[in-house]
Amino acid sequence: MGDLTIQPIGTPRERRKFVDLAYQMNASDPNWVAPLHMEAMELMTPGKNPFFEHADVQLYLARQDGRTVGRICAHIDHLAVAMDPAQGMGPGTGNWGLLEAKNQTIAHALIAQAEAWLREKGMTRVLAPMSMSVWEEPGQLTLGFDHPPTVMMGHQPERYADYIRALGDYVPAKVLRTYELDITREFPPLIQRIVQSGEKNPRIRIREVDKSKF
């Protein structure tokens, strides 16, 4: 097996490879819900994603034997860095996310590269995975691999959690939970009142989607 190389990327063509890798590596997972490709590209593109206006971002691709075998994004959200540490981020906190890797060796090399970049930028703490901001897909899936993700939550192979644990340096910072609701059952009285209130509000309109106006 050839040498593993990790390269910083930034051109439109390289960003497309970065995005496409997730589709390739998760194609066999029936519970992975592919994002719209256009939206995935915009997420990675300065000028399209407002996140770049207040963040430093560096994307990396891992290559071996002429093939792309992994990816990671290292980033510093300056709005989050300015927050009170009690809210979870704060001064000196950087992030990495959007990890994809063929195996543990590649994953660890990518994470090490992301950590090195964050150190060079003066960061002293990593809160990860974070893909990209806390308002996108934060956290690492540790339960629920047998069903698709809920809204705004990521879905990763079970082995990724093992890769992170194997590093030995990462400890859980917060538990994120999602909940299921049986929509065939009648809504509780409180929810019914909220819905009825909205229906009576003349400023609220519910319309069917007209794709011709997209």
Give short role names for the model-derived ranges.
Residues 82-169:
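Acyl-donor binding region in acyl/amide transferases
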Residues 45-61:
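A short helix-loop-beta-strand connector motif used in the catalytic cores of GNAT acetyltransferases and
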Residues 61, 67-77:
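Conserved beta-strand in the GNAT
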Residues 57, 93, 174-178:
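Extracellular structured ligand-interaction cores
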Residues 1-47, 202-214:
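Short amphipathic alpha-helix that is part of the acyltransferase structural core
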Residues 43, 141-144, 188-189:
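Short low-complexity, flexible loop/linker segments enriched in glycine and/or proline
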Residues 2-4, 154-214:
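Acyltransferase donor/substrate-recognition loop-hinge adjacent to the catalytic core
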Residues 60-62, 99, 179:
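Short beta-strand element of the conserved SAM-dependent methyltransferase core
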